[in-house]
Amino acid sequence: MDPKMLFCLPEGDALFNPLNTMFIQMACILVFSQFFYLFLKPCGQAGPVAQILAGIVLSLLTIIRKVHEFFLQKDSASYYIFFSFLLRTAFVFLIGLEIDLDFMKRNLKNSIVITLGSLVISGIIWLPFLWFLIRFMQIKGDFLTFYLAFLITLSNTAAPVVIRSIIDWKLHTSEIGRLAISCGLFIEITNIFIYTIVLSFISGTMTADIFIYSFATGVIILTNRFLASWLPKRNPKEKYLSKAETLAFIILILIIALTIESSNLNSTLFVFIIGLMFPREGKTYRTLIQRLSYPIHEFVLPVYFGYIGFRFSVNSLTKRHYLVLGMTVALSLLGKLLGVLFACSFLKIPKQYWLFLSTMLSVKGHIGLVLLDSNLMYKKWFTPVVHDMFVAALVIMTLLSGVITSLLLRSQEKSFAHIKTSLELFDTTEELRVLTCVYGVRHARGSISLVSALSGFSPGTSSSPFTPYLMHLIPLPKKRKTELLYHELDEDAGNSNGGDDEFGTNEGLEINDSIDSFTRDRKIMVRQVKLVAPMENMHEEICNATEDLRVSIVFLPFHKHQRIDGKTTNDGEVFRHMNRKVLKQAQCSIGIFVDRNITGFHQLHGSDSVQHVAALFFGGPDDREALSLCKWLTNNSQIHLTVIQFVADDSKTEKIVGDAVTKENNEVFLEIVSEDQTENETDRIFLEEFYHRFVTTGQVGFIEKRVSNGMQTLTILREIGEMYSLFVVGKNRGDCPMTSGMNDWEECPELGTVGDFLASSNMDVNASVLVVQRHRNSFDSFVDE
């Protein structure tokens, strides 16, 4: 096409060409989809349903002659196909970047079994129906490609639809939501691979192309790895790469994708692998995620889903075709349902998730449409009737699946709610999800030290599943409350709307460097979140984040910090009040971290030093929660954990276990003694289990201290204050005689009696302190705000 006619056709009465109308179509889809979503969201419907409906409405409007002439001009199909290719390349690359690799590795067996069950059962069900369909549609040749296209199109799962729906339902951080995403990706990748292999066998000329493009993909992956490590060194003082440097990665991906598509091959698998193999740490990764996530999730995917609905048409279908269309939809849903149910039964997945997985994995509309439009030279059976029936079946199944799944979620809301809100019943083999909040680099260093300790680093052993989040809290000045959108806050410092210095992110670069250092050393990805909010509302945003991220414990920085001379400085009462509000409202356990980074707990990564940690146990749910958290410290070879149990001197005791066994660097000082039968049975059972699992194996040291009152407890705490770099203790313990009288000089009730003493600058304690409060629904120990 002549560049001069790119935006205007030469005829005087034709002011627009397909490129212009395509952009107008995109705008209409976005407007219609927002309108539908406004009404459907309260009903629990996901965004893709509203966006596909918007496309269908726009398609129905083409019945009007003027609208038809405007949107469906000459060469418009070529424009739409090419632009959908660009959209597809962008979001497939982002999917590869964002996928949770650790979860996929842990659930590889589950994903493979569900994928095979889905495809095999669907294939068996479709085999007899295909015989009927060939005769009904009067297919004369190319039976293999017809069956292959039919099977792949109708047994496939549209991974982008699954991902977007799971995110809208806030299940992307749950086990079942991530499993659905993994299965959707596996099903789609498997179908692409099968189709490509069979097509290359039929053509006889594509096999060499596949090997060449596989090699080229490997070269792109190596090039990306080199650029990802080299480009940040060019401007080390910048938080993000420049837009030109970001564009370089996009151009590389588009070049390889266009080259592959020009050979009649599908580039989706190659682009996905490039994103999957991209380095997941450092400035480059953060830049790509920050620059791509917002436009793709808010514009690219809605337009792509709307285009699926826009292709919906039944104009070429007659009444007898509707019966076949209904049978196609029913058999497709049945095949997916039976396949997933058999797989879930084999894998012993809880029954409440079976129907959810089967309906969620029934959504269509991605690769099915791509394969339908490609390689037409090998599809002699391709007619407008076949096209309309395929597309109609895909759209109807996607809408039905989305509606059924949302209704299922509403009816079984408790089954999908976040239930791992405390650590006491956790096992270290389960995934630990934590959120640590920081205001600046000073808090970040201490928080990363805590994350490093919980990561369970031990050479030669496999670490427990661990997902840490670091949230950068940025108090928003009142004058900026309504001036900026969230994504505008991440622009370069030179932005006239306010830069890093103005919004408290001038320390962001140092925070990023600290996280990168930890990631390189421990190979554990710390997911970063930025929270920009007025201080008076920040506690609500933190509490919402704990639910959305499904964390079991959130760590908050203490409102005082240690200066370089060792003295303590108050950062402001506003931070203290914010912590206390989170303690009241958070739907998970909370830890307040008093970081004495100069004399206390230090970063473990990059050092071979062993740090001594003490867990203080008086009894009660908070102390049990604190000791439960310490279970993850036992897996770290750089942590020497000692449990110190305080027992009332007048309590009756009996010996229930034999002498403890110890290993090198882990001294067990005394035999554990159970509480009297009059004491809390839950504490006794919990401590026994902990002792038998960790103390008798020599992983943990154990000390018993007998005290009569709070003064004796204070004396012991002063004696051991210099022996440990970190104290872990519960916040409350009710009416405890061992701490009686200690609250007479309490300064910070949010730390509890013991935690307040350990954090006080007037005491001879130089260790850092972590005060833990177990999640509960009622509180009675707070001073009025």
From Swiss-Prot:
Identification of the protein by name: Cation/H(+) antiporter 1
Gene Ontology terms for molecular function: antiporter activity
UniProt KW keywords: Antiport, Ion transport, Membrane, Potassium, Potassium transport, Transmembrane, Transmembrane helix, Transport
Pfam families xref list: CHX17_2nd (PF23256), CHX17_C (PF23259), Na_H_Exchanger (PF00999)
SS bond list: none
Subcellular location: Membrane
Membrane topology category: Multi-pass membrane protein
GO biological process, one term: proton transmembrane transport
Its biological purpose: May operate as a cation/H(+) antiporter.
GO CC field: membrane
Entry annotated with the keyword Hydrolase: no
Tissue specificity note: Specifically expressed in pollen.
Protein family: Belongs to the monovalent cation:proton antiporter 2 (CPA2) transporter (TC 2.A.37) family. CHX (TC 2.A.37.4) subfamily.
InterPro entries for the chain: Cation/H_exchanger_TM (IPR006153), CPA2_transporter (IPR050794), Na+/solute_symporter_sf (IPR038770)
Keyword Ligase attached: no
TM regions (residue ranges): 19-39, 44-64, 79-99, 112-132, 143-163, 179-199, 201-221, 240-260, 294-314, 323-343, 352-372, 389-409
